Amino acid sequence: MSFNLEDTLESDWVAVRPNVFEEKERRKFVFIVAWNEVEGKFAITCHNRTAQRQRSADKAGGRSPARQQQRDSPAQSPARKAREEPEEGEEEECSWAGLFSFQDLRAVHQQLCSVSSELEPCLPTFPEEPSGVWSVLFGPSELSEAEVEDLGRQLRLYLGHALDTSGWKILSQVLFADSDDPEEYYQSLSELRHKGYEEGLQRARKRLQELLEKHKTTEVMVDLLDLYQLEDEAYSNVVEATTELYQYLLQPFRDMRELAMLRRQQIKISIENDYLGPRRIESLKKEDADWQKKAHMAVLSIQDLTVKYFEITARAQKAVFDRMRGDQKKFGKTAWAAAVERVEKLQYGVAKETLQLMRAKEICLEQKKHALKDQMQSLQGGTEAIAVLDELEADYYDHQLQLYEVQFEILKCEELLLTAQLESIKRQISEKTDEVVYYDTYESMEAMLATEDMAASIHIQRVELQKLQQKVRQLEAKRGRISAKKAYLRNKKEICIAKHSEKIQQRLHSDEGYRAAQLKQEKQEDEEERKSTWVSQERQKTLDRLRTFKQRHPGQVVLKSTRLRFSHERRRSTIRTTSSTDAPQSLSVSIQTQGLSDLGDTEVLQPIKTQKPETTTQLEDSSLPPNAITSELPLMTSLPTFTHEKLEPEISTLQPSSLPASPPPPPPPLPPPPPPPLPPSKQDTDTLEIRVIHVKKETEEKDGAKPVSGPLAQLFDSSQLLNARKTLKKTGALEGIQRRRVSSPMDEVLASLKRGSFHLKKVEQRALPPFPDEDESNNILAQIRKGVKLKKVQKEALRESFTLLPDTDPLTRSIHEALRRIKEASPESEDEEESLPCTDWEN
């Protein structure tokens, strides 16, 4: 049957499925034949004994308690339950029955004889049935019991023989089938054509395999060359059969892709030009999305079929090449020189087919990667969203590693192509160089070169050699670029593996941290529960003890009233106030000088016991500067006396007669005095510049003019306080002068930082004169002073940058992090690889 018929001719053909009546296993059937006197027909019953035994065995096994418990076990997988339910629902029929007259049995016999002619003499002879008016007047002829039993026995034997000859499927369809389904017997022409293409491919592959097996028995080079020609023809037949098969398989998907693109174009034109309502536009957009999905699925199917096609062709080409490599070991170099050209051709063909296969795989992996990225970006919030995101990212990393392997194989195939071309060109160069040319005899070399034909031939040979050498250099440069690409891919693969392992480690650490936090939380909950249990137990014990105490000592608890408690507290407060008025009033004040670093600090006068806090605060405001270090002294402190020779403060003690005689606790030890300064030289004294730092003190004259009431007014006078303040200032200035004489500039800087004052010197800007012979564009300092011009950023770029900001949603943040890791693990862009100076190699 030809597979190139037109569709109009194909409509007149019907294809029957092969082996449609073939039985997978033998079964035992039993026929029971009896005469029905009421109907006047034979009742034929058939039982499938094999199915009946299986059913009874299943029922017996199902009644056992162990089997029933295993069937009802909740641990049984739902997939297994779903698989067993339809099997139980679609139980095989075990019995069939029907009524057949003599005429019906003759019709059945004719159908069975058309299948097998052996059944023609086997049908028993039935009595003739009257027809027409005679059957109405006289009725059917009556049969005796012996005749009926004899006919029944013969009919059983006939049915058994028909079962053995025709098979159960044909016999059951003839006897007991109610209606025939043509789809069960007939085959569609497209399926038939597909099967025809596959059979053609199998025949071509079998022929090629037979020729490859002949290499083992071929020992002569001439026979081997003839075998090579047959192999080339067989391989071309394999390629042709594979192309026909996959062109037929690709055609529906190509039609779907073209139809989807055409329909999408029509929808786009309709939306842009027609005046449609919002519902119609929405329905058209939905239809456009459906067609886009169909086109995408068609493209994926086309890519998968393309990969399968190149797998078949590359496998066949590689088998031929490997067999020829094995033949090379059996022959010497001189004998094998006749087959070198075919070896180079096969090597080039294997590399080319493998290259096309790897490029098809690369396209498929890229599509899968883009699909995974789209799924990541379209994830919605949910309980399992983060887990799904991690799974998609792991799949993306696996596809990326596979893509690196495929790209590495692509570069290897390109390198093999270049190597094959280089070997071929180098062989041509060596042949042209070693070629022996016989010339006519000449008296000298100049006379030979003087002829035009000879000079032209030599020039042509040189030009050809130069072209071949130039091509060799170009191919070597391309091979170098391929090596650079391989190194780049190797580095990217290592980065991808590192990122993937880092992500796995982070996931493990996060899981461990989560488990640790969960264990800690459970431990805290157990501890709190234990504490609450202990508290409740102790409370119960206390209540039990109180209850026992009340039962043992009833009526002995005395409670005081609120009135009695208030009177007792009032009495205690009066006693405390009288004791405080009888106590002598005392006040101690400490004054301590600080160095230059603490000059800005303040001194505080703190009383030990005062009755009037208002007068104490007034005294503190009108006295020494605040924030000084204070200490409680047992006696009243008078103003210290300072001299220029001795910079340490001297504390003298003043004991007025009004103070009590009981000594208070001893004062804390004073800090050690500073070391004496070195004597300054004359030069230092002459050039010494004393800068007095005026620290603004917030003092109020009114506070100083206010009279101090009570015993504090007897301690200090305002003139004494002013003299003490002046003395402290002079002491701080002199001490600072001596410190400047012996300190370094860094000490002065630190001292100024402590004081909080800075003396900055204004420096005039110096403009260096430009060099006379130097251009301003080449001067780096001039360019730096001139500044950098900033470019305006477009709003779209700003909007895109803001959209990439981390979101508060954990799922969105996880998606952004996953995409960032994917971008780092993947190659930067396709343009980066294309930017390398590599042109396509010539065929």
UniProtKB/Swiss-Prot annotation:
GO terms for cellular component: autophagosome membrane; cell leading edge; cytoplasmic vesicle; cytoskeleton; endomembrane system; nucleus. GO terms for molecular function: actin binding; microtubule binding. Its main location: nucleus. Residues 190-225, 359-385, 416-487 form a coiled coil. Residues 562-574 have a biased composition (Basic residues). It is found in: Nucleus; Cytoplasmic vesicle; Cytoplasm, Cytoskeleton; Endomembrane system. Residues 66-76, 582-596, 613-630 have a biased composition (Polar residues). Residues 661-680 have a biased composition (Pro residues). Residues 776-793 form the WH2 domain. Residues 49-91, 518-537, 558-632, 652-688, 821-843 are annotated as: Disordered. One of its GO terms (biological process) is cellular response to starvation. Residues 827-843 have a biased composition (Acidic residues). Keywords: Actin-binding, Coiled coil, Cytoplasm, Cytoplasmic vesicle, Cytoskeleton, DNA damage, DNA repair, Lipoprotein, Membrane, Nucleus. It is a lipid-anchor. Acts both as a nuclear p53/TP53-cofactor and a cytoplasmic regulator of actin dynamics depending on conditions. In nucleus, acts as a cofactor that increases p53/TP53 response. Increases p53/TP53-dependent transcription and apoptosis, suggesting an important role in p53/TP53 stress response such as DNA damage. In cytoplasm, acts as a nucleation-promoting factor for both branched and unbranched actin filaments. Activates the Arp2/3 complex to induce branched actin filament networks. Also catalyzes actin polymerization in the absence of Arp2/3, creating unbranched filaments. Belongs to the JMY family. This is Junction-mediating and -regulatory protein. It comes from Xenopus tropicalis.
